[in-house]
Amino acid sequence: MRILFAAAECAPMIKVGGMGDVVGSLPPALAKLGHDVRLIMPGYSKLWTKLTISDEPIWRAQTMGTEFAVYETKHPGNGMTIYLVGHPVFDPERIYGGEDEDWRFTFFASAAAEFAWNVWKPNVLHCHDWHTGMIPVWMHQDPEISTVFTIHNLKYQGPWRWKLDRITWCPWYMQGDHTMAAALLYADRVNAVSPTYAEEIRTAEYGEKLDGLLNFVSGKLRGILNGIDLEAWNPQTDGALPATFSADDLSGKAVCKRVLQERMGLEVRDDAFVLGMVSRLVDQKGVDLLLQVADRLLAYTDTQIVVLGTGDRGLESGLWQLASRHAGRCAVFLTYDDDLSRLIYAGSDAFLMPSRFEPCGISQLYAMRYGSVPVVRKVGGLVDTVPPHSPADASGTGFCFDRFEPVDFYTALVRAWEAYRHRDSWQELQKRGMQQDYSWDRSAIDYDVMYRDVCGLKEPTPDAAMVEQFSQGQAADPSRPEDDAINAAPEAVTAPSGPSRNPLNRLFGRRAD
């Protein structure tokens, strides 16, 4: 099956949030199932210094009255084919924000749709978040391309209808107040990035005023848990760490802790309880909750706190002042550094995610993989990935709290600090987290079922043989009988520059360009 991802990010080249991790890691797992997965994304100027890109574009066209070119490259890690939409509007260093953000991503979505119609025609066009939300609308009456829309964060919903009408053409049948709402209505299938988040967004508390619409389309909505790349995130082989370690031998983690303390200017103490946080510094992530409890925690315990991230200026200022008040006990780096983030995962004893809401969260998976015990709020994907620790029966992998209140968070932190005093049981807790399997392989089977469903194909049974095949890293047989109709379809070829073959244009007697 031919699957085209359309997204604004792809790790490791361009990553701002969890969407970049998903887009960079899910395709290889889908390829193991026999799918041909490719990506189209904006051609950000910084990519030209990170990737080997075709000298000449493979296609030129225009849309929204503007010319663009498409270049081809390969993912540096997994070899996935990537198509870059080249235009000066993507030259600035910023990825998000700016006065032209709405036009920028609507233009990208339109270019991606034109590419799918004219150059490489997929069976499924998989769109990610509001940046690609108009694609399901334009594809709605094309019977040859099915659309899947993934909600990574419902809070960000894109431009409103009145603005869309000014910057592009909206089909007469289009409904929905903004890009996100339109995508939810017109995508053939919709998924959220965790089962719990898929349920939460149908309530008024987490629905961001779209709960009514999400209940209306609930028949095509499902939750599929995110995963992580276990090869890229492996404490036994991670070259960014001063010492490697595993669940069977944690001695290297102690070395990482000392190096982290030295590098961050903290007191070098093996017995200190080090809390790590790698996050966008925004209200969603509960940074304000940390600021409310940190002074008391540092005053009454031997805790140390390390924070890495950028975001809201007010929260950055609050963290900077906290570090100034507790020199040697609290360190804040207001930037993003991949190597330093890995050192924090490896060198911290516990990891903080006191989120207001959390669609899935990937940081807690990295933390557990590196032996850092998560302290999380019971919300969204954190519910699905961090079962609460129970000393009575030695179960669970982290410390959880319910309400978004300082006293609840503080209580969870004290519980974690007290548990750290009992080193033998703490190491068992670390090992349980490190042994969890949150690879993309199992999630890929769920996506495979969804793709087959939307294309009207028979769903394969994820039996023991398939799971075993995945665990050995083998690719599935792409010539399964039920796939014959789709696999027999001719490969698309590079199309010449020229008029769009958008079927809606033929239907309405107009051109998208």
From Swiss-Prot:
Keywords: Glycogen biosynthesis, Glycosyltransferase, Transferase. Its EC number is 2.4.1.21. The keyword Transferase applies. It is an enzyme of class 2 (transferase). Coiled coil: none annotated. Pfam families: Glyco_transf_5, Glycos_transf_1. InterPro entries: Glyco_trans_1 (IPR001296), GS/SS (IPR011835), Starch_synth_cat_dom (IPR013534). SUPFAM superfamilies: UDP-Glycosyltransferase/glycogen phosphorylase (SSF53756). It comes from the Bacteria. Pathway: Glycan biosynthesis; glycogen biosynthesis. NCBIfam families: glgA, PRK00654.1-3. This is Glycogen synthase. It comes from Parasynechococcus marenigrum (strain WH8102). The gene is glgA.
